[in-house]
Swiss-Prot record:
Keyword Nucleotide-binding: yes
GO molecular function terms attached to this record: GTP binding; GTP cyclohydrolase I activity; zinc ion binding
Catalysed reactions listed for this entry: GTP + H2O = 7,8-dihydroneopterin 3'-triphosphate + formate + H(+)
EC number of this enzyme: 3.5.4.16
Protein name per UniProt: GTP cyclohydrolase 1
BP GO annotations: one-carbon metabolic process; tetrahydrobiopterin biosynthetic process; tetrahydrofolate biosynthetic process
Amino acid sequence: MSKPTREEAKEAVRTLLKFIGEDPTREGLLKTPDRVVNSYTEIFSGYGKDVAEILNTKFYDTCNFQDFILLKDIKFTSFCEHHMLPFIGTVDIAYIPDNCIVGISKLARIVNAFSKRLQIQEKMTVQIAESVQENLKPLGVAVKISALHSCMSMRGVMQDNSVMNTMHYTGIFAEQQKYRYDFLNLTAKR
């Protein structure tokens, strides 16, 4: 599949405007195709991100740190691949290092890399956890995503406040309930 040109993308926006009954040549919509293409370039910039490269800078002097590292409430906005409507939420990531750690900003960067794509929350949860597991090789990883989906609030069942939670565990988090319990207790929204 070849990537359409910028002009072809702008023409597609004009077509959608006509589809909903709008006139793409009216004053307020003249620059809309260009704005939408610019927005999509930013919103979907995760396709160009290499997660392995993001997690490449590791620190090995951890002073024998053996408990888990938790970064909570990483905010994100993504777009569901089914309706192309936003879902907005937070990600909590914990890992128990084996022999290395990464700077905490790297965890937020991988959330951005995966959220700035067409997504489903379940897949994004697994992608984040498995990428940390694969690249850092920790004893285990836990990821929890909580999100509001506008495909449920703007259309269909019209549920404004329904929050979807997904979790994925690897290693010791998957094997031992105590670690899952501690993670869920620390990430519970109060």
